[in-house]
Amino acid sequence: MSRRAWLPRGFAVAAASLALLAILSGCAGGPDKPKPTDLGPNAALLDVRQVWTARVGVVGFPLDLKVNGGVLTLADSEGVIAAVDGATGRDQWRTALGAKIGAGVGSDGRYVAVLSSANDLVVLDAGREIWRETLGALGHTAPLVAGARVFVMTADRVVAAFDAQSGRRLWSYSRTGDQQLALRQAGVLLAVGDTLVAGISGRLVGLNPLNGTLRWEAPIANPRGVNDVERLVDLVGRVSREGDVVCARAFQAAVGCVNAARGAVLWSKPAGGFEGVHGDREFVFGTESDGKVIAWRRADGERAWVSERLKYRGLTAPLVAGRSVVVGDAQGFVHFLSRQDGTPLGRMSTDGSAIVAAPVLVGNTLAVVTRNGGVFGFRPE
């Protein structure tokens, strides 16, 4: 099931879930699928121009764009990884792994890590592969590269750490008794101070990055319902981090914020989306499954505004960029909304295929990637 449908994308892990997946996929592709809202004239209140384009192959996995020091690192489904200069769009290096990619990318500016669709963790140094290690399950979350270590989370909810240079496994952490299904979608894995924070089921979990021991758990959503699909509340990337506070979305259940220094839930509010969130010190922004764009007040989670101008357009997770909230859609448009009230400020077109990853800023360039492999750099005048 495509994320670009207004229903959730498919599930993976338990063989018993395949029948459910078929039912849900059929619903998403039926004749009653809502028509994307007409955009109307371009407001053009924000002066933005396209400054470069680049290209990779088709992207059919949950791509996470990584930015380090003015360089954008990305990959395509066939195993090509590229490091692109954010100012010019030119390759700094490009490598073909010879293996299809299932999740990525992770990078600290030197090491780059991806997960292959054959369950391999593959690590490169300066664009050259240095090792690969077979994992026990598929992964859909980009590895985290930090502190000369590579951290991974697989669909069986195992978190593991490897030495970035040698590939030696350092530790692993797993939970028992969690949900039997897992999303075929990027989850949550990031560093906050000296804590590794992972999204496991509906919780943010704080781990010691040196040995994998549990420090705290903070539930953003609790499983509810009578079957495994209804009880699925995995946390989905991207997240919004300001200092020690991390805000995240639980799939089709809630948006909430956690103090990652103390493991304390600050607030959690019902929300019906399946893409991650982004924000600043004042607001947390998210896109709902029907295309609403919502701003929650970061202090208490109360709604500041709701925009319905992009309903059923298959929106990405948002990006806060200056006075704008930026989202991509399934028709290849990049939309700029006012962060204060959601008013449309303008839009840019790409190649007509869906925007497949949340937009990112590379220096003063906004970068987006389409399903057909188009990489576009936009810059405000």
Question: What does each model-identified segment do?
Answer:
Residues 76, 116-117, 154-155, 199-201, ...:
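Structural signature of WD-repeat beta-propellers
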